[in-house]
């Protein structure tokens, strides 16, 4: 379960960072 959670986070974090900072 933790492995899947980390895998999802690695995909979500860059997208959120991109949306917030407008740096893509």
UniProtKB/Swiss-Prot annotation:
Keyword Disulfide bond set for record: yes
Matches recorded under InterPro entries:
Antimicrobial_frog_1
Give yes or no: UniProt keyword Phosphoprotein: no
Which GO CC annotations does the UniProt entry carry?
A: extracellular region
The residue ranges crossing the membrane are none
- Give a brief account of the tissues where this protein occurs: Expressed by the skin glands.
What does the UniProt entry say about where the protein is found?
Answer: Secreted
Q: Mainly resides where? A: secreted
Q: Which domain of life is it from?
A: Eukaryota
Q: Spell out the disulfide connections.
A: 18-24
Q: Name one GO biological process term.
A: defense response to bacterium
Which terms are listed as keywords in the entry?
A: Amphibian defense peptide, Antibiotic, Antimicrobial, Disulfide bond, Secreted
**Protein family:** Belongs to the frog skin active peptide (FSAP) family. Brevinin subfamily.
Function (record text): Has antibacterial activity against the Gram-positive bacterium S.aureus ATCC 25923 (MIC=3 uM) and the Gram-negative bacterium E.coli ATCC 25726 (MIC=24 uM).
Name of this chain's protein: Brevinin-1PTa
